[in-house]
Amino acid sequence: MSKSSDRINLTNQFLIAMPNMADPTFSGTVVYLCDHSERGALGLVINRPTDIDLESLFNRIDLKLEIEPLLHIPVYFGGPVQTERGFVLHEPVEGSAYNSSMTVEGGLEMTTSKDVLEAVATGTGPKRFLLTLGHAGWGAGQLEEEISKNGWLTVAADPRIVFDTPAEERFEAALGLLGVSSSMLSGEAGHA
């Protein structure tokens, strides 16, 4: 790709780890890409729940969560970068402006400020959200190189997979967007 205008933008795409993914951190994962530019990429793993639930996380940060259906929702491992920091992927909330939000091209938002969690705790925050600890990050050209080496498949993201599909089904559901299943994948790249 010789010109920056030729560069593909993978923002609002899923990265689906191929079977040959050597890094166990990302093996079997689906990553939602929040940002992809010439400077690099930032994404959140959406299918790795941790043993931490919202109730225990909110207690750790001195927030009282009293909304019963939310108490036992898992917090996810978002990636190996900044694992002590929370990242909330959510649908936009009309009339709200959180302190540290980024609108993802395509409609979702990613917020890193505590005010979004305060809003969730009081029932005024986003109704559909996914909270991760940590994120995945790639330097300039790094993700493109991993894709060219058959490390990832890409497909346009579907918010229903992020918010409505059980975590253990997200990998197959994301592959389904491409019309394939994991049984059809090979870790070997084809060569003519």
Swiss-Prot record:
Top-level taxon of the source organism: Bacteria
HAMAP family: UPF0301
Gene Ontology CC annotations of this record: cytosol
Source organism: Burkholderia mallei (strain ATCC 23344)
Name the UniProt record assigns to this protein: UPF0301 protein BMA1997
Family: Belongs to the UPF0301 (AlgH) family.
InterPro entries attached to this UniProt entry: AlgH-like (IPR003774)
